[in-house]
Each structure stands twice: as C-alpha cells, then as structure tokens.
Amino acid sequence: AMKFDISSEDIFGFIKPVVDVHTMGVYTIANLLRDCGYKVIVAKDEINSSIEKVHKLNNYTLVKQWITHNRISRLGFSYRLDPQEGADMFLRLYHLLKDDNMFAEQGGEIKSIWFAGLPDTCAIVKGKTNGAVQVFPGNEMPEESLRALGIPEDSLPKSLKSQNEYDDFRIAFAK
C-alpha cells in the first residue's frame, strides 16, 4: 500500500458497530487526536448500525455519504466482540470501499484505514488484507498509538511528551 503522510488537513473518522458497547477506547484516541490539532468525527448510531449490515445497498450508501460528506481521509474501525464476526464486518466494508475506488491509491479520499479489536480479530484482518490494514490489538500506550497512526512527533500533545502520568494508562481502543 502507498504511504500518505499525515497532514493537518486530514480528517479522522471512527466507526464502531452499535452492538459493541466498548466506547472508551474510541473516545480516548479521538480526544488525543483532537489534542494534536486534528479534526475527528465519531460516527453516530445511524452509521454505526448501518455498518452491521453494510452489504445492504442503502446501508453502504449511508456510510459512503458519511465518509465523503465529512471528507474523512483516515478511517478507524473498532470492534471488541466476537473475532470472526468483527473481522467479517470490517472486511465487508473494506472490500466495498475498495470496489468503489474509495482509497487514495485508487484516486479516492481514504488515505488509511485501520482496525482496533481483540488480538484474534486483528490477526484475521491482517491476514485477509495482506497487511494493508493497520491493526491495534489494544495494549498500546497513547503515544504508541499516535505514532503508529503516523502522527508527527511535533504534533504530539505536550502532556504526552513531558509527563509520565500516561505510563500506566494503557490506551486500548479497547476498554
């Protein structure tokens, strides 16, 4: 996959299927990205429930409109429940986006997509996409997560750089 460096113009979008109530991690990373100065959009329930049956045409259309309307260029997907179900849900969306030329290397908007979930789910996603999708199994430190997403060092919030109080704070897109 081509590498597209993060720029201040990038807009991050987060999707999390409604059935999964683990919102803590999504909000944590969203707030950290906002602290770095990026615009972040967290999908509302309408989008998050569409994702559960994204193979239904009107559902995909809703998700696509959400992405294009908000000019989302970095897309995160979080799912902490059943690995096979989570992988299937994510991969269906991934292939629909790909078939629709939504990725930057195809001339589309989305410069990167990543998946946060249980280690087993991450392994399936990584395997089925030949490593094209970055995965977060949920034991990363905030700083590690931001670096892994490609956030430039000078954008990292001072609180992360200067204090150790985050050290015990395991970010998971998880909890």
Regions found by a protein language model. Name each.
Residues 1, 142-175:
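Flexible inter-domain linker/hinge segments
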Residues 1-43:
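ATP-dependent carboxylate/acyl-activation modules
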Residues 3-5, 56, 71, 101, ...:
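Short, flexible coil/linker elements and helix-boundary hinge sites characteristic
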Residues 5, 10, 20, 35, ...:
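Acidic-enriched, low-complexity/disordered segments with a strong bias for Aspartate over Glutamate
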Residues 7, 50-53, 58, 82, ...:
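Serine/threonine-rich low-complexity intrinsically disordered regions
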Residues 30, 39-132:
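Cofactor-cradling patches in redox/metallo enzymes
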Residues 133-142:
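Short acidic-hydrophobic, aromatic-tinged amphipathic segments that line or gate anion-handling sites
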